[in-house]
Swiss-Prot record:
Residues 244-336 form a coiled coil. Residues 1-39, 292-330, 434-477, 502-577, 791-815 are annotated as: Disordered. Residues 10-21, 292-328, 806-815 have a biased composition (Basic and acidic residues). This is Chromatin assembly factor 1 subunit FAS1. One of its GO terms (biological process) is pollen development. Induction: Cell cycle-regulated, showing a peak in the S-phase.
Length: 815
């Protein structure tokens, strides 16, 4: 565009100069019109010479040697049209010859090109332009006359390579200037060669002369083209430099991008290797975890197999026990048949004898089996009972039954035992009927019937009916009642409530008694015993009765171990001045005399005072369970620590000194040992003397160390059930600790609040834990109606969410 604008500026400047020449020529219009024939001939000959020079200059511009500049951009052509346009530009051949030549050149580069494609491309892309004297009858595509000066040009320069566009524009401008001059000269020749007799001769001649004066001559065209070529070459050089600079910048940018890509590729490679290592590490850890899980499963399977074996052994023992019981029942039936034969001799007396109730018979038989030395009395009492002839009515039997029941309840309440702890007790009251048995140890759960036998049974066996006295009637005015809720997991209460409420009355049953704690829910703390774990004393076989003594001995050992203190443990008042207490008075006197002699030297006194101060600090550290840090003690071989290149014994001593080096304790302050610290020593001595005067307390040893206190606290917080379940969970984590110690530890560090065991705040503060706030905010007091509705209404089929959450937490902890 810059070249075209420059050409236009030069043309405008030339047109601005031409009017002056025209004005000069217009001053002599008659000079051209009044030429003689000789002058015309000379003018025509000069114009012919100029025409010949223009033709030669056109051929010079269209020289083939100059067309080689166009082929420098042939490598930039990517399509068939662009290649055809570059080969066709400034060619003067007819269409057929041009197509053949272009086809041959393209055939060398691309074998797939065809003649038809080349011809269609030439026709569509290029056009044939005449820059000479145009013949109207000539064929534009096939004419080959030299006077027409034919030239093929590309319709649109955009399809040409950008490097040759400027040169093509200059050459086209030069050809146009030559064509304009040729046209003007040919018009002037035509006007001069016409006859003067024609009408428009003068006007045509003047117009041709005026047009010829406006058009640049050959010399002007040459100078104009030289200037344009120089300017174009400078511009092209500048463009080339800019292009090279851009290419250099692009190359630098490309190199930088490649370097960044290489860097990113290396980073990705490193990251990939790191991820591969992490993946391998995870796989290794997973393999280790799988192996551990496999070992756990194997141990669990072994435990399961062992448990199944134990259960099978128990089942075998139970079957053997049942068979033994069947044999014993057969023996009892045999004894009963023998008694029937014996009773047949006194039919009259047996017919008149009243039948006693079954409860009395069972009570009598239980009292018979208690002690071996009372067998004769019981047999005699049974014989007296069989021989009684008194008649008893139904009311007498009922009254007698109630009296024995009340007396038994009174005896149980006096011994702090509650009859009816369970509505369906697992133990049988009388497993077999026999007159004499081996003496056995009575269980704690069976009611002791000896006192009842001393009272009511002796009177009954002597032939007198047991009738309650007046004193017994006064005591049994308040009849015992059974308080049993329908859907409650706890056993019912059977007995007499000793006190009466002053607030809760028949007309005010829903009032709150201040003496009762309505927030405590005993059902949440109660836990049913699992089946197969608790066996009553009546179901024990002979082997278990023999092992009972061993178990009692073990229990006694455990109870004795409660008072034992582990090795290295020191309570608050123990470990203080132990050496002083162990020294005999005689030895102490001897030491005092010797110490008095040694104290004469000041150095020995200072050393003794330091030892005494060190002993006091050590006792203080042992008493307070804190470490003693000493910072200013030196050793005679401290220089060996910094020495290098040691060998032999010195090298071994250096290693030992480094291992035994006293280092700063990070959580405690340094303690300087002062020689003149007499006041502190006196205070410590007074404290130690006081501690010696007081006897040491027999504190129980802590079986669970303080390092495991955090585990105990987390277990208590995660378990929302009763203390039995908490102790069972702790037993799984600490199998070596007895349950009594675990129960004591739970009660020591926690309180039962809000229907669960909660850890004390001081324990949480000691461990650095924050007490969890109440989730439910303030808890409203429970009313007595809520208390009774919870126990009297049928339970919902959906389980409580708190119990589910607690069970899930417990399973997670066990896992």
């Amino acid at each position: 565009m810059d070249e075209v604008s420059t050409v236009n500026e030069n043309e405008n400047r030339k047109t601005m100069i031409e009017p002056k020449k025209l004005n000069k020529r217009k001053r002599e219009p008659t000079a051209i019109e009044n030429l003689t024939s000789e002058e015309k001939e000379s003018q025509i000959s000069s114009l012919n010479l100029e025409m010949k020079g223009l033709f030669d200059y056109f051929r010079e511009v269209m020289d083939k040697s100059k067309r080689t500049d166009l082929f420098s951009g042939f490598s930039e052509c990517s399509s068939l049209n662009s290649m055809v346009a570059l080969l066709m530009e400034e060619m003067s051949l007819p269409l057929s010859k041009l197509v053949d030549e272009i086809y041959l050149k393209l055939k060398e580069k691309t074998e797939s090109v065809t003649m038809v494609a080349v011809k269609s491309a030439v026709v569509s892309v290029g056009q044939r332009v005449s820059y000479g004297v145009l013949n109207v009858d000539a064929d534009v595509l096939e004419d080959d006359s030299e006077s027409c000066l034919w030239c093929w040009e590309t319709r649109d320069l955009k399809i040409m390579p950008s490097s040759v566009r400027g040169v093509l524009k200059l050459r086209r401008t030069c050809r146009k200037k030559i064509h304009e001059r040729i046209t003007a000269v040919s018009a002037m020749l035509a006007a001069l060669q016409r006859e003067e007799t024609e009408k428009l001769w003068r006007s045509d001649l003047s117009k041709a002369a005026e047009k010829l004066g406006k058009i640049l001559s050959e010399v002007d065209i040459r100078s104009f083209m030289d200037n344009m070529m120089q300017k174009n070459s400078s511009e092209m050089a500048e463009k080339d430099s800019k292009r090279e600079e851009k290419l250099l910048l692009k190359q630098l940018e490309k190199n930088r991008c490649e370097a960044e890509k290489e860097k990113k590729r290396m980073e990705r490679q490193v990251l990939k290797e790191k991820l591969q290592q992490e993946k391998e590490q995870k796989l290794l850890q997973k393999a280790i975890v799988d192996e551990n899980n496999k070992e756990k499963e194997e141990t669990e399977s072994r435990k399961r197999i062992k448990k199944q074996q134990d259960e099978s052994e128990k089942e075998q023992k139970r079957r053997e026990k049942e068979q033994a019981e069947l044999k014993k029942q057969l023996q009892v039936q045999k004894q009963a048949s023998i008694m029937e034969r014996f009773l047949k001799k006194s039919k009259d007396s047996s017919l008149t004898q009243p039948k006693l109730p079954s409860s009395e018979v069972t009570a009598q038989e239980l009292s018979c089996t208690k002690h071996e030395n009372e067998i004769g009395k019981v047999v005699q009492a049974i014989d007296n009972a069989f021989s009684t002839t008194c008649e008893a009515t139904v009311d007498d039997i009922r009254r007698e039954h109630f009296a024995s029941w009340r007396q038994l309840g009174h005896l149980l309440s006096s011994s702090k035992k509650h009859w009816g702890m369970r509505r369906q007790p697992k133990s049988e009251l009388f497993p077999k009927l026999k007159l004499s048995t081996n003496s056995g140890v009575t269980s704690d759960g069976e009611p002791n019937m000896e006192k009842q036998g001393d009272g009511c049974e002796e009177n009954n066996f002597d032939g007198r009916q047991c009738k309650p006295s007046s004193s017994n009637r006064k005591k049994s005015r308040r009849v015992k009642q059974l308080l049993q809720f329908d859907k409650s997991c706890r056993p019912g209460f059977y007995g007499i409530w000793p006190s009466q409420s002053q607030v809760v009355k028949p007309r005010r049953p829903l009032q709150k008694d201040p003496e009762l704690d309505y927030e405590v829910d005993s059902d949440e703390e109660w836990e049913e015993e699992e089946a197969g774990e608790s066996l009553s004393d009546c179901e024990k076989d002979e082997d278990e009765s023999l092992e009972e003594g061993c178990s009692k001995a073990d229990d006694e050992d455990d109870s004795e171990d409660d008072f034992m203190v582990p090795d290295g443990y020191l309570s608050e008042d123990e470990g203080v001045q132990v050496d002083r207490m162990d020294i005999d008075p005689s030895e102490q006197d001897a030491n005092t005399t010797s110490s008095k002699q040694d104290q004469e030297s000041p150095e020995f006194c200072a050393l003794l005072q330091q030892q005494k101060h060190l002993q006091n600090l050590t006792d203080h550290a042992l008493k307070k369970t804190q470490p003693l840090i000493i910072c200013n003690l030196t050793h005679e071989k401290v220089s060996l620590l910094a020495a290098k290149d040691l060998e032999g014994t010195q090298k071994v001593e250096q290693i030992c000194l480094r291992a035994l080096m006293v280092r700063q304790f990070p959580w405690s302050s340094l303690i300087e040992i002062s020689i003149n610290d007499i006041q502190d020593e006196d205070q410590e001595a007074s404290k130690f003397s006081c501690s010696q005067s007081t006897p040491p307390s027999n504190s129980k040893a802590k079986i669970i160390p303080d390092s495991d206190l955090l585990t105990v606290v987390s277990t208590i917080q995660s378990c929302s059930q009763g203390i039995n379940r908490v102790v069972e969970t702790l037993q799984q984590k600490f199998p070596d600790v007895p349950k009594t110690k675990l129960r004591q530890k739970v009660r020591e560090i926690s309180d039962f609040e809000d229907s669960r065991w909660q850890v004390k705040k001081e324990v949480l503060t000691k461990l650095g834990l924050s007490p969890s706030p109440d989730k439910g905010g303030k808890r409203l007091p429970k009313t007595i109606s809520t208390f009774f509705s919870k126990r009297c209404l049928p339970p919902s089929t959906k389980p409580q969410p708190a119990v589910e959450d607690a069970a899930e937490r417990l399973e997670n902890e066990n896992a």
